[in-house]
């Protein structure tokens, strides 16, 4: 491994993965998604294919580019290891998303909405008939362009839920099983833990993550009212609890 690998993280471009991860970590901390050093982000460099990964144990609002780990996008070997820091325990999960989902970025948060939904729902989080669902990718493609189409507002958004493990790297096998069972999923909720979201670019992954957090927050409020989040549009009044 090169001893002078800082060139991999030195850039004045705010869109460079080493800089962008720091910006997003601060935003996610402010949203209460990544407090107490929890959560993580990884971004693939669009030109080099290198994988940039936020470290373990660093407060997200204080993250700096020199804290970044850099991984070879083909061999998955470390190209840069920041002195004194540990790699994220999520790294094997991020690598699996890159390898098997052709991800360009992965976001992992400890969102309260994701954790609460994992307590309410069983094996799947399901919600339908909400405008924000249109931000979530579907299993359909445009026949003329081949591009993945997003869900319609009245479609049902389904996000699988897996059980937590003592250590995050132990989630790799359940994650791989989820890839097989839900080949078009863009996220997985980990019960009592948080959520992993991936997309072809960091911009897409960020949008999906924000949309899902909105949908999960809404689902919790619907549950409090006695309304199943995946009930048919127009049927809500049948379920509203009488107080």
From Swiss-Prot:
SMART domains: Aldolase_II (SM01007). One of its GO terms (cellular component) is cytoplasm. Pathway: Amino-acid biosynthesis; L-methionine biosynthesis via salvage pathway; L-methionine from S-methyl-5-thio-alpha-D-ribose 1-phosphate: step 2/6. The keyword Metal-binding applies. Keywords: Amino-acid biosynthesis, Cytoplasm, Lyase, Metal-binding, Methionine biosynthesis, Zinc. It comes from the Eukaryota. Its EC number is 4.2.1.109. GO terms for biological process: L-methionine salvage from methylthioadenosine. Gene3D superfamilies: Class II aldolase/adducin N-terminal domain. The keyword Zinc applies. It is found in: Cytoplasm. Its cofactor is Zn(2+). Zn(2+) binds at residues 108, 110, 193. It catalyses: 5-(methylsulfanyl)-D-ribulose 1-phosphate = 5-methylsulfanyl-2,3-dioxopentyl phosphate + H2O. The active site is at residue 131. GO terms for molecular function: methylthioribulose 1-phosphate dehydratase activity; zinc ion binding. It holds the Pfam family Aldolase_II. Substrate binds at residue 90. NCBIfam families: salvage_mtnB. Catalyzes the dehydration of methylthioribulose-1-phosphate (MTRu-1-P) into 2,3-diketo-5-methylthiopentyl-1-phosphate (DK-MTP-1-P). This is Methylthioribulose-1-phosphate dehydratase.
């Amino acid at each position: 491994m090169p001893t002078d690998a800082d060139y991999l993280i030195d850039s004045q471009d705010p869109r460079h993965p080493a800089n962008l991860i720091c910006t997003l970590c601060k935003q996610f901390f402010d949203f209460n998604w990544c407090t107490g050093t929890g959560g993580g982000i990884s971004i693939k460099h669009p030109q080099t294919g290198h994988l940039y990964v936020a470290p373990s144990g660093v407060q997200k609002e204080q993250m700096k580019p020199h804290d970044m780990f850099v991984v070879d996008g083909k061999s998955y070997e470390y190209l840069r290891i920041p002195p004194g820091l540990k790699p994220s325990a999520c790294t094997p999960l991020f690598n699996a998303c890159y390898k098997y989902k052709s991800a360009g970025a992965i976001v992992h948060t400890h969102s309260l909405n994701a954790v609460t939904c994992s307590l309410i729902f069983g094996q799947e989080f399901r919600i339908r008939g909400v405008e924000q669902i249109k931000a979530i990718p579907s299993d359909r493609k445009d026949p003329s362009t081949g591009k993945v189409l997003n869900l319609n507002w009245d479609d049902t958004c389904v996000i699988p839920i897996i059980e937590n493990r003592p250590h995050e790297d132990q989630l790799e096998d359940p994650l791989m099983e989820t890839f097989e069972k839900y080949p078009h999923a863009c996220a997985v909720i980990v019960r009592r833990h948080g959520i992993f979201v991936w997309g072809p670019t960091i911009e897409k992954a960020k949008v999906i993550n924000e949309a899902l957090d909105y949908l999960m927050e809404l689902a919790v409020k619907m549950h409090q009212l006695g309304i199943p989040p995946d009930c048919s549009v127009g049927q809500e009044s049948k379920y509203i609890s009488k107080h």
